[in-house]
Structures are given as structure tokens and as C-alpha cells.
Swiss-Prot record:
SMART domains hit by this protein: Elp3
Gene Ontology CC: cytoplasm
Lineage of source species: Bacteria, Pseudomonadati, Pseudomonadota, Alphaproteobacteria, Hyphomicrobiales
Stored PROSITE patterns: RADICAL_SAM
Pathway(s) annotated for this protein in UniProt: Protein modification; protein lipoylation via endogenous pathway; protein N(6)-(lipoyl)lysine from octanoyl-[acyl-carrier-protein]: step 2/2
Keywords linked to the UniProt accession: 4Fe-4S, Cytoplasm, Iron, Iron-sulfur, Metal-binding, S-adenosyl-L-methionine, Transferase
EC numbers on record: 2.8.1.8
Name of the protein in question: Lipoyl synthase
Predominant location category: cytoplasm
Cofactor note: Binds 2 [4Fe-4S] clusters per subunit. One cluster is coordinated with 3 cysteines and an exchangeable S-adenosyl-L-methionine.
Record organism: Rhizobium meliloti (strain 1021) (Ensifer meliloti)
Cofactor: [4Fe-4S] cluster
Entry binding sites for [4Fe-4S] cluster 2: 87, 91, 94
Subcellular localization: Cytoplasm
Pfam families, A to Z: LIAS_N, Radical_SAM
Length: 322
């Protein structure tokens, strides 16, 4: 995740996506004051970076260009991205490189577990690129990473942010059986945007995936997130909330889409903090246990603190029902 500046960074200007090379440049809008963040320079940031590099790990923080990297890494929080740094999908919003992935690193589960222990993480988030090239979409690798972390750091809670495992029968079941504490799968945007923003995915397949998690394990916490500013209408966001509640999703995150480069989908609108607060208020009335809605909200931002609040919210709900 790179720091957000007014100009597109040199890194963002490099075309990491061959499929986007033919696209015309889109205008990169000047970011409003409420989205400015400082460049990461702290000692904690440098220490986290050193640990990540020493174990030859990939983080979505760097690969996706997250604006919160300075804050998170200063606190020694990081989201590990497993199964390589090359994705088989070509989403119009994403800065992760697209192409033919390398073979899985068989040492990665152990290396992630070592890093988690070295960083002293009480809560860790594990995500991945899409691996449509693998028969199980990478489900077994997720399982191995979860087991390795459990063995090395049994007190650490584990949150996984999964791909959709489209056309990978049995993959989700294997991941749920590995017993992470939270399963997150992001819808990313409203269904009317899928053909242009997330063409390799299917909106209702993602809804069904989240619903299936609860069928397999009703006690599992589920989570999903979207970006706004991609041209969606407010009523579409509210309908998406209803779809997620139909799937009994516990936690919703809503953040501002930020354009990684001129070859990516343009920012149609910078949603104001007041509008984000309104979304949060409505989402709580629809029954979500937890909602995080702000311009800089990201799926794994403050994930550890949010998990503690999520557990407390469920306990209050259960107590009220007695």
C-alpha cells in the first residue's frame, strides 16, 4: 500500500497490467484534503518492512497501494498476501499485477508463521491473489498457512480475505474447515459495475459464498467490503447492504476508491465524510454487528481492534436475546 499523494507516483505509472496497456489514459482527479496522508518514515514502519522482506513475503499493503501503510506498519500490522504477487484476474480498480503466476512457494506457510510470531501479532490478516490456474483456487494453501500460524502462535486470531473460488468445488468448504476466526470476501462494488470494474467475478456468486460460510459454520464471523466513488448510486449501495444481510454477513467496510494509475478505472466521485457517516448509520439499522465507513477505510485497516469490537457486539446481541 503506497502513500497517497496528489500526483500519481512513479510506481503507479509503471504498467503492471498488460491488459490495461491499450486503454486510453483517464484523468486522475486531485484528492480532497480529507484523503491526504503522510509518507511512511517511522522506525516502526522500517522494522515491519525489514521483517516482511527478510521472510520473502508479499503484502497487499504494498501491492495494492494502500494509503494506510504508514499507520499500519508503524504499529507492526500488515496484511500478508499469499500465493505470489501475480493475479489471474484483471480487475479495473486493482494495482496488483496481472499475468501468469509462478508455482506456489511451499515454504510460504512456515515463513508467514515466523513473521507473525516475530511481529508479535495478536491478530493477523491473510489474503491472496486470485489463482484461477489452480484446481482448488489455492484453498489448500490457505489451509496450510492457517495451520502454520496456529502452531507457531496459538493465541493469534486469524482473519482471511479470500478470492471467490469461482468454479472451484469444495474449495470454500476446505477453508472454512480450517477454522479461521473471520472469513472476509469483498464484493468490491455494486452489481451494475461488475462488467467494467470486476469482469472476472459474479456478484451473486460472491453473495452465495458468504451465505455458504454461515451454512457451514454459523459461529464463523463474516465480513465484506466495498469501494465507493466508482459511479454507483446510493440506492444501489443500500440494496447491496440488504443482499449482504440476507447472507447474514456480520461486518461491512466501505471506503473511497482511489485510482492507482491513469490506466485504471477513473474516480467518478470523492464521497464526503458526511456521506460515509450516513452509510454507516443506515448499515447499522439494517442489522450489521460492525460497520466501518470512512474515506480511508480498507478491509484490514484496524482489523485487530475491529475484531475485538465484533466479538463484543455479538456477545451483547446474544445477551439481549436471552
Amino acid at each position: 500500500m503506497v502513500t497517497v499523494f496528489d500526483a500519481v507516483s512513479d510506481r503507479a505509472q509503471r504498467v503492471r497490467h498488460p491488459e490495461k496497456a491499450h486503454r486510453p489514459d483517464t484523468e486522475v482527479l486531485r484528492k480532497p484534503d480529507w484523503i491526504r496522508v503522510k509518507a511512511p518514515t517511522s522506525k516502526g514502519y522500517q522494522e515491519t518492512r525489514s521483517i516482511v522482506k527478510s521472510h520473502k513475503l508479499v503484502t497487499v499493503c504494498e501491492e495494492a497501494g494502500c494509503p494506510n501503510i504508514g499507520e499500519c506498519w508503524d504499529k507492526k500490522h500488515a496484511t500478508f498476501m499469499i500465493m505470489g504477487e501475480i493475479c489471474t484476474r484483471a480487475c479495473a480498480f486493482c494495482n496488483v499485477a496481472t499475468g501468469k503466476p509462478n508455482a506456489l512457494d511451499l515454504d510460504e506457510p512456515a515463513n508467514v508463521a515466523k513473521a507473525v510470531k516475530q511481529m508479535g501479532l495478536s491478530h493477523v490478516v491473510i489474503t491472496s491473489v486470485d489463482r484461477d490456474d489452480l484446481d482448488d483456487g489455492g484453498a489448500e494453501h490457505f489451509e496450510k498457512v492457517i495451520f502454520a500460524i496456529r502452531e507457531a502462535s496459538p493465541e493469534t486470531t486469524i482473519e482471511i480475505l479470500t478470492p471467490d473460488f469461482l468454479r472451484k468445488p469444495g474449495a470454500l468448504e476446505r477453508v472454512v474447515a480450517a477454522k479461521p476466526d473471520v472469513i472476509n470476501h469483498n464484493l468490491e462494488t455494486v452489481p451494475s459495475n461488475y462488467l467494467t470494474v470486476r469482469p472476472g467475478a459474479r456478484y451473486f456468486h460472491s453473495i452465495r459464498l458468504l451465505q455458504r460460510v454461515k451454512e457451514l459454520d454459523p459461529t464463523m464471523f463474516t465480513k465484506s467490503g466495498i469501494m465507493v466513488g466508482l459511479g454507483e448510486e446510493r440506492n444501489e449501495v443500500l440494496q447491496l447492504m440488504d443482499d449482504l444481510r440476507t447472507a447474514d454477513v456480520d461486518f461491512l467496510t466501505i471506503g473511497q476508491y482511489l485510482q492507482p494509475s491513469r490506466k485504471h478505472h477513473k474516480v467518478e466521485k470523492f464521497v464526503t465524510p458526511e456521506e460515509f457517516k450516513s452509510y454507516e448509520t443506515v448499515a447499522y439499522t439494517k442489522g450489521f454487528l460492525m460497520v466501518s465507513s470512512s474515506p480511508l477505510t480498507r478491509s484490514s485497516h484496524h482489523a485487530g481492534d475491529d475484531f475485538a469490537r465484533l466479538k463484543a457486539a455479538r456477545e451483547r446481541k446474544l445477551a439481549a436475546a436471552e
